[in-house]
UniProtKB/Swiss-Prot annotation:
Keywords tagged on the record: 4Fe-4S, Iron, Iron-sulfur, Isoprene biosynthesis, Metal-binding, Oxidoreductase
Entry's family note: Belongs to the IspH family.
Lineage: Bacteria, Pseudomonadati, Campylobacterota, Epsilonproteobacteria, Campylobacterales
InterPro entries in alphabetical order: LytB/IspH
Organism, as annotated: Helicobacter pylori (strain Shi470)
Protein name as catalogued: 4-hydroxy-3-methylbut-2-enyl diphosphate reductase
Catalytic activity of the protein: isopentenyl diphosphate + 2 oxidized [2Fe-2S]-[ferredoxin] + H2O = (2E)-4-hydroxy-3-methylbut-2-enyl diphosphate + 2 reduced [2Fe-2S]-[ferredoxin] + 2 H(+); dimethylallyl diphosphate + 2 oxidized [2Fe-2S]-[ferredoxin] + H2O = (2E)-4-hydroxy-3-methylbut-2-enyl diphosphate + 2 reduced [2Fe-2S]-[ferredoxin] + 2 H(+)
Ligand binding ([4Fe-4S] cluster): C12, C92, C186
Cofactor annotation remark: Binds 1 [4Fe-4S] cluster per subunit.
Pfam families hit by this protein: LYTB
Residues engaged in binding (2E)-4-hydroxy-3-methylbut-2-enyl diphosphate: H36, H70, H120, T158, S214, S215, N216, S258
Database matches in CDD domains: lytB_ispH
Active site, renumbered: E122
Designated gene of the protein: ispH
Enzyme class: oxidoreductase
Length: 274
């Protein structure tokens, strides 16, 4: 099987930074899953004795805590600080940016519209910085059902698709007196998405490598399917199915921002033997 890799794929700056922080802070607790890749989390737990804790009330005062890349709600961060916990913040700088924008814009009286998945930890963290009621919408259709104020500030989950953000921005501009638009989709996400789109036009089959709970990985799969119907998401090489590759000659591979090189290489090696 011939293989072609996407021009841009895999670990982004924020994930690399977070993993380095975890490796340097052995025996620490991580507030929530550091990244959305179970295989890499297992490696960190095994080799560096870091453990995940979802409840801030269960974190002892004398324990070192790493804040996940997606960030955490403002009230949880303040709780840990008041508790006297030693905090190492691995929140991606690209996530901190929308947190700051939401806080400042809501203080200025703007209604916050956040384009993202309301159940995603990044979105939960970002929206907690709003000082007034904010809207979280995952599509233009959801926005069309909401009541908008005159002054609106639009931000996005960092892993969303730019064309959808532009549709939402256009809708707001047509209906609100004043609209502040902030493109908070991170550069790595945009590059990886464009590379996946370009590659999907050339290949017979696309394999997207990454965690099934990863937002940016699921976005890559959605993009790949636009031009390559036979696109599949796998967490590792063991999830590959031979039947997918029947009568296929050229396989494209891309990977989510939280997918380590060692997993990508294992997938690539197995496909090369088909």
């Amino acid at each position: 099987m011939e293989i072609k890799m996407a021009k841009d794929y895999g670990f982004c700056f924020g994930v690399k930074r977070a993993i380095q922080i975890a490796e340097k802070n052995q025996n620490s607790l991580i507030f929530g899953s550091l990244i959305h890749n179970a295989k890499e989390i297992n490696r960190l737990e095994k080799n560096f004795n870091v453990k995940i804790e979802e409840d801030p009330k269960k974190i002892p005062k004398n324990k070192s805590v790493i804040i996940r890349t997606h960030g955490i709600p403002k009230q949880d961060l303040e709780y840990l600080k008041n508790k006297g916990v030693k905090i190492t913040d691995a929140t991606c700088p690209y996530v901190i940016k929308p947190q700051q924008i939401v806080e400042s814009m809501s203080k200025e009286g703007y209604q916050i519209v956040l384009f993202g998945d309301i159940n995603h930890p990044e979105v939960k963290g970002v929206i907690s910085y709003a000082t007034n009621q904010a809207l979280v919408i995952n599509s233009l259709e959801e926005l069309q059902e909401k009541k908008l104020q005159r002054k609106v500030a639009l931000v996005s989950q960092t892993t969303k698709q730019t064309p959808q953000l532009l549709q939402i921005a256009s809708y707001l501009v047509e209906r609100c007196t004043e609209v502040r638009i902030f493109n908070t989709i991170c550069n790595a996400t945009s590059y990886n998405q464009k590379a996946a789109l370009d590659l999907s036009k050339e290949v017979d089959i696309m394999i997207v490598v990454g965690g099934k709970t990863s937002s940016n990985t699921k976005q890559l799969l959605s993009i790949a399917k636009q031009h390559c119907e036979d696109s599949y998401l796998v967490e590792d090489e063991n999830e590959l199915e031979l039947a997918w590759f029947k009568n296929k000659k050229l396989c494209g591979i891309t990977a989510g921002a939280s997918t380590p090189d060692w997993i990508i290489e294992n997938v690539k090696q197995k496909i090369s033997t088909i």
